[in-house]
């Protein structure tokens, strides 16, 4: 029987000031979903590997399976399908773990059904999966995970997503403190209103970062990686955030921000030598607050969700 294995990359939601709008796929991290035809007419989750906590095997409560079933609905097909999910991303890390699983699930079933769906349809199906855990429809993680590179979500309904490109010089230092922040909780803390000055600066910074990825311009990114609207509220969930940011900048980083809803934070540089120093100092500061971390020095992933193996 036919089978396919798919990889979907991790993502940085918001890229600083671009709340719910900007997102970036990163290399070296992500989730795998293997889908295979089985007897019967239902989709089932056969196994889940490397999960850091209990992830439901109920297809109605699993992001990959929800996205997969949505693809089947789009094709108007009922068939037996078994899913095997291998997690490469911790839950509640701010690296788009639920989005990655949903993206992989959507693309895997599209391939199993001989393809034909557009990127927009794949994004819509994956958003339905992620909505189960995030509480709403957002594409700032889903879109870059499927498309690769940086993306801009203009609207959700109707769906309008632009692929912006990448920045060749960009080196990303990802630090994930070993604490969990749920997306729903991090949204509840956000203010209903922000100051005019914060709004204006975030608009300018978001526009500049958009231009940076469109023009492969590292200097434009580093000069505008500042978030005055959301970071002051979400950073309260991350112990030692302010000191970690100071440590990053003092050790040569050109900017630091929260990845998505956190707790992962990311710093940027265009120097491999500096990247190792920045990583060391950020981890050291988290350790000073009694927090262990996972860390990775990486680059943007120009490729999005992709087929690893097909039989």
Q: Each PLM stretch: what is its role?
A:
Residues 1-13, 79-88, 126-135, 239-252:
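Short, hydrophobic/aliphatic alpha-helical segments
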Residues 118-250, 272-311:
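ATP-dependent small-molecule kinase catalytic core of the GHMP/sugar-kinase superfamily
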Residues 60-63, 97, 101-102, 205:
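Catalytic-loop motifs flanking and including active-site residues across diverse enzymes
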């Amino acid at each position: 029987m036919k089978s396919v294995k798919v990889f979907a990359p991790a993502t940085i939601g918001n890229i600083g000031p671009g709340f719910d709008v900007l997102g970036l796929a990163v290399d070296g991290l992500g989730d795998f979903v293997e889908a295979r035809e089985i007897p019967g007419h239902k989709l089932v989750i056969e196994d889940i590997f490397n999960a850091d906590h209990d992830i439901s095997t109920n297809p109605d409560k699993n992001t990959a399976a929800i996205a997969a079933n949505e693809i089947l609905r789009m094709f108007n097909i009922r068939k037996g399908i078994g899913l095997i999910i291998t997690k490469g991303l911790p839950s509640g890390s701010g690296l788009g773990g639920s989005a990655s699983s949903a993206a992989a699930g959507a693309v895997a079933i599209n391939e199993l059904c001989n393809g034909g769906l557009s990127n927009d349809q794949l994004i819509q199906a994956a958003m339905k999966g992620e909505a189960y855990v995030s509480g709403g429809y957002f594409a700032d993680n889903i879109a870059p995970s499927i498309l690769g590179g940086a993306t801009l979500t203009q609207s959700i309904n109707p769906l309008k997503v632009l692929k912006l490109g990448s920045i060749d010089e960009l080196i990303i230092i990802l630090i994930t403190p070993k604490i969990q922040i749920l997306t729903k909780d991090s949204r509840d803390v956000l203010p209903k209103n922000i100051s005019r000055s914060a709004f204006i600066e975030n608009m300018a910074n978001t526009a500049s970062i958009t231009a940076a990825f469109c023009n492969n311009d590292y200097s434009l990114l580093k000069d505008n990686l500042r978030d005055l609207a959301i970071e002051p509220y979400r950073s309260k969930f991350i112990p030692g955030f302010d000191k970690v940011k100071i440590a990053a900048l003092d050790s040569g980083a050109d900017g630091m921000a929260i990845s998505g809803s956190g707790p992962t934070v990311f710093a940027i540089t265009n120097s491999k030598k500096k990247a190792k120093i920045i990583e060391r100092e950020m981890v050291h500061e988290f350790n000073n607050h009694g927090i262990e971390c996972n860390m990775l020095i990486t680059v943007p992933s120009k490729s999005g969700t992709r087929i690893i193996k097909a039989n």
